[in-house]
């Protein structure tokens, strides 16, 4: 939940910084889909989205879209780094398990959102910059692998 909230707040923050009005919109369809995935091996947490009001071109749209996955990548990276630092002192503890879970969930959120399928963030980032899309996609894949096999 933390990763989802920070992800959406990042979209809103960047949109406002770029001069647009942004508001979180609750979407009952996505909330229902999220609820249904609790019974599946993979989870989807998407109860809404940030609606951006204004004339948003591909560059602005891509930068706003990149903010969410970038935040998830940073949270995953910080959590993995903290896990590595603490595990060398304390071994496997509940704190380390929590940090590894946070790293995994945020890497998963970043990777899922970077899929180049509309309406996901990846399609907007790719429409703006293939290079930036590749950086974010590869970073999320690497972090997901590290969080599983560390």
Which residue stretches match the model-derived regions?
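Hydrophobic transmembrane alpha-helices and their immediate loop junctions
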Residues: 1-150
């Amino acid at each position: 939940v933390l990763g989802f909230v920070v992800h959406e707040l990042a979209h809103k923050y960047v949109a406002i910084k770029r001069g647009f009005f942004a508001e979180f919109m609750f979407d009952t369809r996505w909330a229902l889909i999220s609820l249904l995935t609790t019974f599946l091996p993979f989870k989807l947490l998407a109860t809404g989205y940030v609606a951006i009001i204004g004339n948003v071109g591909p560059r602005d749209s891509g930068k706003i879209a990149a903010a969410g996955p970038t935040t998830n990548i940073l949270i995953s990276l910080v959590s993995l780094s903290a896990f590595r630092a603490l595990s060398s002192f304390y071994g496997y503890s509940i704190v380390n398990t929590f940090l590894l879970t946070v790293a995994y969930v945020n890497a998963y959120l970043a990777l899922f959102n970077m899929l180049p399928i509309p309406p996901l963030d990846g399609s907007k980032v790719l429409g703006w910059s293939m290079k930036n899309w590749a950086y974010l996609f590869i970073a999320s894949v690497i972090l997901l692998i590290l969080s599983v096999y560390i």
